């Protein structure tokens, strides 16, 4: 039976309904500080921990719950410990509801100082949580307001929390404190080793980096059917990220490893555009990208950029999907569609395709969203900041050929350049205003990627422009582009043979812009 609960929370979401329900059931509530005041102000019967322990808070609240009566009450195993607990003057505590000081939010506050951050390292909270989690054979510990209703439902039914739920909650509690300690370690190890610590002078890559992940769901399989797989959600994932996407399909096949990797690649690319846009992806590479006056028009154009490759593809859209777009989408066999949202009548159309997976992200992260990216190598991770640049690099670039690009060519180069960033290197994108016409991806030689892009484009290559994710090492790329009627090029520049490359462009009357930025993708 739950007779006594200790409640001490920084996040007060759902606090009052929880406490009122417990009080109605005759549960004695112990509490501290701001939580105690919130309960008392709301008329919920509450006993301060000071009264329970007989010891006042000291050191400006640094020491409140670090007391044998508190931890003895939590850790006591039952009759075997009754005598010891009685000698301490304590009583059994059956339920601990505790979440921790907002360390992560404090670190992110503009202008925060090192002493402020240190004061937001919780000590008493993790100690109580770990004590309760260790003793989950008797005690229920709740660190997430999302679990309040389930815990209350069990108490309503049987007067206690089941052993299976206590074990699940204890597992979650240890993950909670582990992630918290990881954040503290990450912060401290990012500070300069010499001199006074300063929150404003932190290193981007701390010495110790802890990743807090929670399994969201199993996958149908891994990259291949003989490999198992699961999807893990990152703690604190940003709103609008794939990790928080809602599945809205008709209940057909589950997502696979490849589906998620492709969906992520497509959604990353579609974020580049502010006007209605569609991206079609196969094996993480865009095969067609377009913008338009509507999603329906944008998708139709993107699909037709490479209709053969679009079959069985992944589509990302950057607006709420309406019925008109849905009706065009179902014309082609697709694996997945991802978008911020869908209208009810769009869902009605899309759900006629039983095995079409639909994901709604609820928001669209900006193209320049900053975060770290990770890639596993044998025994470790390589970590870098996300490649968030591309916008403005063409218009802000340097014209190096005799002929400057026209406004129409600049518009096409800008689109091609944004897309090129999302194509596996060596990457070549041919574009006209509002759409790609040919993409060459992942080749070991750049000229081969040019050849593939021109082959994909066919006659559409004539009059198109070319974007290259890295410099041209030889003029052969420009010569081949000229043979296919390409009129302008955007590339980073920086080759030892830049002069020869520019001369080849001038000989063919091709406009050329050096962006000064490379966008390798591996």
UniProtKB/Swiss-Prot annotation:
One of its GO terms (biological process) is 'de novo' IMP biosynthetic process. Residues 1-143 form the MGS-like domain. It catalyses: (6R)-10-formyltetrahydrofolate + 5-amino-1-(5-phospho-beta-D-ribosyl)imidazole-4-carboxamide = 5-formamido-1-(5-phospho-D-ribosyl)imidazole-4-carboxamide + (6S)-5,6,7,8-tetrahydrofolate; IMP + H2O = 5-formamido-1-(5-phospho-D-ribosyl)imidazole-4-carboxamide. The lineage of its organism: Bacteria, Pseudomonadati, Myxococcota, Polyangia, Polyangiales. Its EC number is 2.1.2.3, 3.5.4.10. Keywords: Hydrolase, Multifunctional enzyme, Purine biosynthesis, Transferase. Pathway: Purine metabolism; IMP biosynthesis via de novo pathway; 5-formamido-1-(5-phospho-D-ribosyl)imidazole-4-carboxamide from 5-amino-1-(5-phospho-D-ribosyl)imidazole-4-carboxamide (10-formyl THF route): step 1/1; Purine metabolism; IMP biosynthesis via de novo pathway; IMP from 5-formamido-1-(5-phospho-D-ribosyl)imidazole-4-carboxamide: step 1/1. This is Bifunctional purine biosynthesis protein PurH. It comes from Sorangium cellulosum (strain So ce56) (Polyangium cellulosum (strain So ce56)). The IMP cyclohydrolase activity resides in the N-terminal region. GO terms for molecular function: IMP cyclohydrolase activity; phosphoribosylaminoimidazolecarboxamide formyltransferase activity. Belongs to the PurH family. Pfam families: AICARFT_IMPCHas (PF01808), MGS (PF02142). InterPro entries: AICAR_Tfase_dup_dom_sf, Cytidine_deaminase-like, MGS-like_dom, MGS-like_dom_sf, PurH-like. GO terms for cellular component: cytosol. HAMAP family: PurH. It comes from the Bacteria. SUPFAM superfamilies: Cytidine deaminase-like, Methylglyoxal synthase-like.
